Amino acid sequence: MEKTAQWQAQILTAKNSDWMRSNEYQSAIILYPVLKALNSKEADTLKTAMNYAWSLGEEVNTKLDILKESPKYNSEPPFDMAFRYAEPSDRMLKMTRKKFNLDKIAGKGDDISRIKNLLYRVHDNIEHDGSNGLAPGARNLENTYESARRNSCGYNCRALAICLTETLLAVGISARYITCIPKGWETDSDCHVICIAWSKSLNKWVWVDPTFAAYVTDENGIMLHPGEVRYRLQHDLPLILNEEANWNNRVKQTADYYLKEYMAKNLYFLETNIWNQAEPEGESNHPQGKTVTLVPVGLTYPHANYNTSNEKWFWQAPVIK
């Protein structure tokens, strides 16, 4: 055991060993407390090496470590603007509601069951293919669905999230799509796009991800929104991924990978559209909104129209008419 610690210390302090340092650091996290409990003389040496490796950069950090190190949010004065949600009486949403028979699909249950039914409908009818981008033409449910059928293909997470947002809005459920962005966005282009839907019964937003048919709950089965999931990841609080979560009905998802790896990486910055409607971006004949990104204090995301560190403002409730 002590020889193992000596080897790990050498790797953690060696030059040009980034490719090895990460694996050895994770092993050292397990070994160090054992050595400490045994009063081994190698415990302090290993701890010093771990601290040195940590100071060199993020190659030793897990994705969850990086999220936990994130600066906090604040209560800066909010923007003088409000999120907008298209009404189901909107011309395009009425067409969507009728064409896809959304009232029947949503069902007559409570709002949570309706949200889940629509989540599964989009997931089951438009496959995910991250390499295929968005459907050519209008960024709406009809065009994306018809294009996927016609070309026997899938589209990326953004396309699916835009479709689910439109589906929810069409039946009168306020919704937004959220682009989840990693800290290292300059070199890591792998973001993920999900939706949030407003639950009147819970009086809060809930996370719904059409790519993976996924939602997240606490230990009491209460659905959570991305901000709550982010906080719970940072503080090691219980998170439960629904059993049905999967990729294209072929690969089951687990909380360890989906939440603690994939989404832990992608919950560093959160971007959303101010105007939430059918065809919220891309080719469209109607005015479109600006984007705003929720950023930790002291950081900015330059691709957004606005940045804010006011978490309360970002997750504000929709005005229900």
Regions found by a protein language model. Name each.
Residues I162-P238:
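Hydrophobic/aromatic-rich core segments of domains that either
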Residues S40, D44, A106-D110, N203-W205:
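Structural helix-adjacent loops and short alpha-helical linkers that scaffold large soluble proteins
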Residues K116, Y155-E166:
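A structural signal for well-ordered alpha-helical segments within the folded catalytic domains
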Residues T4-A49:
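Alpha-helical protein-protein interaction scaffolds
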Residues H235-K321:
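Low-complexity, Gly/Ser/Thr/Pro-rich intrinsically disordered linker/tail segments
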Residues C153-C157, I178-C180:
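Short His-Asn-centered micro-motif
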Residues W54-Y155:
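Secondary-structure boundary elements
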